[in-house]
Amino acid sequence: MTKEKIVLAYSGGLDTSVAIQWLVESGYEVIACCLDVGEGKNLDFIKEKAITVGASASYTIDAKEEFAENFALIALQAHAYYEGKYPLISALSRPLIAKKLVEVARQEGASAIAHGCTGKGNDQVRFEVAIHALAPDLKVVSPVRDWKWSREEEINYAKEHNIPVPIDLDNPFSIDQNLWGRSNECGVLENPWTTPPEAAYDLTVSLEDAPDTADIVEITFDAGIPISLNGENMSLANLILTLNEIAGKHGVGRIDHIENRLVGIKSREVYECPAAVTLITAHKELEDLTFVREVAHFKPIIEQKISETIYNGLWFSPLTEALIAFLKSTQKFVNGTIRVKLFKGHAIVEGRKSPNSLYDENLATYTSSDTFDQDAAVGFIKLFGLPTKVSAEVNSKVTITTEV
């Protein structure tokens, strides 16, 4: 009898390694699938481990460029910070992982997909909603959520089935990383009063250890896309990874956040996103230079909504598609170069230039070269202030009594 095929989102860690054996015992033929989205995974090791543990096939996919160009770029152009702080690190990679899982499932003729998420996090929602959007006929299985084992029970199960137990299990933190940043939770971070220890960080240095000399970087954008760093053209993925190193050594991009999860609880998260913070800061300044006022004032409304829909796992929803369409329509003239000073945790814009700049020095100056028609201000003020004046004239005739 042919076994039912299931594609597992495989990380190489304890949870998903145990999940392979658990799914095999449940009657499935397991196909493992692992993506590198910029966290620097050893894909060859992970591919071999999946087979050793019990998978019948193992896919490893270098998805850094696709992640950068189709997912991180949207977050950059949307200046996406969930609740004004979280730059959607993990939330951005989940729809891409789900997309690849569905592609492998179709290729293998699988009828189900499995993930290693717990029952109290956001990722279970992101994976399952994305999979249902892309392949509503596929069943989704969540071993970790179903078995409800403690960490000790999981380790014992692994030992009983000769599953290699990772040597870093004593690490108190739960970490997720991609090229857009690094997320950290659990351990001492669960107490919101506790200062995050330096051991919680990897991409950035503390302000105390940051250099006393700044780095100056120039980032060039073409239609809202970063295309070069300090005059050197590079792919978006490489530009982000390079900027992570440069900005990270100055302590840029540390975020400590009490976050409202989709599942209804608050969690304390520590993030590192040096490139994301630097790029969003630079991109925002270039938009300020090239946007007309009405677009500049309206776009933040769209930015907030995009941040929420992505965080909530609705990447493939009609709403997100429409929001992204608006976003892309605004980027045509976002061309130019931004000069940023990286120093002691700050990304400070010190210069900007653009062939599409709407800044006219002759209109803005107060020198003799001023070309602004100040006489036009009289009529403008009269018309602009007319509703306020009429309201005051009408309502001043009404006696207002205020009771104390």
UniProtKB/Swiss-Prot annotation:
One of its GO terms (biological process) is L-arginine biosynthetic process. Disulfide bonds: none annotated. InterPro entries: Arginosuc_syn_C, Arginosuc_syn_N, Arginosuc_synth, Arginosuc_synth_CS, Arginosuc_synth_type_1_subfam, AS_cat/multimer_dom_body, Rossmann-like_a/b/a_fold. L-citrulline binds at residues 86, 122, 126, 174, 183, 259, 271. It is found in: Cytoplasm. Keywords: Amino-acid biosynthesis, Arginine biosynthesis, ATP-binding, Cytoplasm, Ligase, Nucleotide-binding. Its EC number is 6.3.4.5. It catalyses: L-citrulline + L-aspartate + ATP = 2-(N(omega)-L-arginino)succinate + AMP + diphosphate + H(+). The keyword Amino-acid biosynthesis applies. ATP binds at residues 9-17, 116. One of its GO terms (cellular component) is cytoplasm. Pfam families: Arginosuc_syn_C, Arginosuc_synth. Belongs to the argininosuccinate synthase family. Type 1 subfamily. NCBIfam families: argG (TIGR00032), PRK00509.1 (NF001770). Homotetramer. This is Argininosuccinate synthase. It comes from Listeria innocua serovar 6a (strain ATCC BAA-680 / CLIP 11262). The lineage of its organism: Bacteria, Bacillati, Bacillota, Bacilli, Bacillales.
